[in-house]
């Protein structure tokens, strides 16, 4: 079975719906994938006197689209910024590793996806600038867990080589009309209280929903989506703090798998695979009442559920905070202008710029200092009944535990979902059979 790359869907899919999402944010000031390469944003051509900084990204990263390059160049007339973009991270990242290995072909600033940052900090930190020492960078302005992700292990020097651009704090998006029809509250505060602090309460709410709603209206979109959210709320997941793979013996991982499997065995799942046409149609048809949703998914839901879903969908706090998604900027030492590039990377990821990126592109800030800025603190989403998404997702982001991210986290997570849980959800296999199938696939992938 081909393992589906859930992680890569995020950047491409968000870019397609970010314009709609931004239009629905009731903000004070308030996409589509680029070609293989995109030139300087608003910079005059042929200006030989300007120092050119290059930025390499994947997908529609948002920095250029939000006008941040233009703003920086206006503030720094001697700087010209050029961006190149490769559409998919699975093509971009191997090239980045190759270029880091040779020290050639690198942009002055390179983007790194969260699923790759552990490998970068563990194996490439010596080739990257310590951005934690860049003037203007304040560790206290960033979420501790995000800062930790971009920092190399102590055994590798402990340098902070990646500055976070965005994150994906999760809530629970739900159909309030379906909740109310099943005798459950529709108000987001009351809904969040149903399962506050315990994912098992989310399961019990699903059982109560099914008892009234009956067959044909599933409670969740997929068991895999539940598993990812539950696993993401644990401090230790697939690796321990010594870098050892421990998912097989970690009770948090097996517990998340078994709990998610219960949504399938109890008949609460719509048995859909995320980011497939069937899943998209499920939003349009109202085939399920809830989905674990990171901040960036709201625009996707709006796009797929369409006008008919406006004011029917809402968003509440998840049982426990977790995160899905996010990226970083790194500065290779081999670059021609490493010092100037570090200053640009620091500016692009500063709280003020992250707030602008959220306002214009819907990318949720990884700098906690941005949460007090009006563009974030006052953000509401018209499609989701005016939900105070700035408040909801800021609270979730600040509660995410500092987690150990391993170099093969994505491989393990994909196989648990697409090999293990999918068999339970769609094929009726027992949870034990699904677990064993996933372990076998992971062992093969990791050559264990």
Regions found by a protein language model. Give the residues of each.
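Glycine-centered hinge/linker elements that transmit conformational signals in sensory
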Residues: 203-207, 242-273
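Extracytoplasmic/periplasmic substrate-recognition and gating elements
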Residues: 265, 304-369
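Conserved N-terminal structural module of periplasmic/extracytoplasmic solute-binding proteins
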Residues: 2-119, 138-140, 186, 336, ...
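Paired acidic/hydrophobic, glycine-rich loop segments that form the ligand-binding mouth/hinge
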Residues: 108-111, 289-294
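Hinge/lid segment of periplasmic solute-binding proteins
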Residues: 113-171, 312-314
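A ligand-binding cleft/hinge motif common to bilobed small-molecule-binding domains
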Residues: 116-121, 295-309
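Short helix-initiation/N-cap motifs at beta->coil->alpha
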Residues: 85-98, 115, 195-201, 271-285
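C-terminal capping/gating helix-and-loop segments adjacent to ligand/active sites or protein-protein/ligand interfaces
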Residues: 384-440
């Amino acid at each position: 079975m081909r393992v589906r790359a859930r992680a890569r869907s995020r950047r491409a899919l968000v870019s397609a719906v970010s314009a709609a999402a931004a239009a629905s944010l009731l903000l004070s000031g308030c996409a589509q994938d680029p070609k293989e390469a995109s030139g300087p944003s608003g910079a005059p051509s042929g200006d030989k006197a300007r120092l050119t900084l290059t930025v390499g990204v994947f997908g529609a990263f948002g920095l250029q689209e939000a006008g941040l390059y233009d703003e920086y160049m206006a503030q720094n007339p001697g700087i010209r910024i050029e961006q190149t973009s490769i559409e998919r991270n699975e093509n971009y990242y191997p090239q980045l590793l190759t270029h880091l290995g040779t020290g050639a072909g690198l942009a002055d600033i390179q983007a790194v996806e969260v699923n790759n940052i552990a490998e970068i900090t563990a194996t490439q930190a010596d080739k990257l600038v310590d951005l934690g020492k860049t003037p203007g960078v304040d560790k206290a302005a960033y979420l501790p867990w995000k800062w930790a992700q971009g920092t190399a292990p102590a055994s590798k020097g402990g340098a902070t080589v990646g500055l976070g651009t965005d994150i994906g704090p999760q809530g629970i998006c739900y159909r309030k009309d379906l909740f109310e029809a099943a005798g459950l509250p529709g108000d987001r505060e009351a809904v969040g209280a149903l399962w506050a602090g315990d994912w098992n309460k989310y399961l019990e709410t699903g059982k109560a929903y099914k008892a009234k709603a009956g067959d044909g209206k599933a409670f969740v979109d997929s068991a895999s989506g539940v598993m990812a959210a539950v696993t993401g709320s644990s401090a230790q997941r697939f690796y321990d703090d010594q870098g050892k793979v421990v998912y097989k013996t970690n009770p948090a991982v097996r517990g998340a798998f078994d709990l998610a499997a219960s949504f399938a065995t109890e008949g609460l799942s719509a048995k859909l695979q995320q980011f497939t046409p069937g899943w998209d149609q499920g939003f349009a048809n109202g085939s399920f009442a809830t989905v674990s949703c990171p901040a960036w998914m709201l625009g996707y839901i709006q796009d797929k559920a369409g006008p008919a879903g406006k004011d029917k969908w809402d968003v509440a706090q998840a049982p426990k905070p977790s995160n899905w998604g996010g990226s970083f900027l790194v500065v290779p030492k081999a670059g021609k202008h490493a010092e100037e590039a570090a200053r640009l990377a620091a500016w692009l990821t500063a709280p003020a710029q992250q707030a602008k990126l959220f306002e214009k592109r819907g990318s949720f800030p990884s700098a906690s200092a941005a949460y007090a800025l009006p563009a974030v603190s006052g953000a509401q989403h018209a499609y989701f009944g005016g939900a105070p998404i700035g408040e909801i997702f800021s609270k979730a982001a600040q509660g995410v535990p500092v987690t150990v991210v391993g170099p093969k986290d994505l491989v393990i997570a994909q196989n648990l979902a697409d090999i293990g849980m999918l068999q339970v959800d769609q094929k009726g296999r027992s949870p034990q059979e699904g677990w064993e199938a996933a372990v076998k696939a992971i062992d093969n992938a990791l050559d264990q």
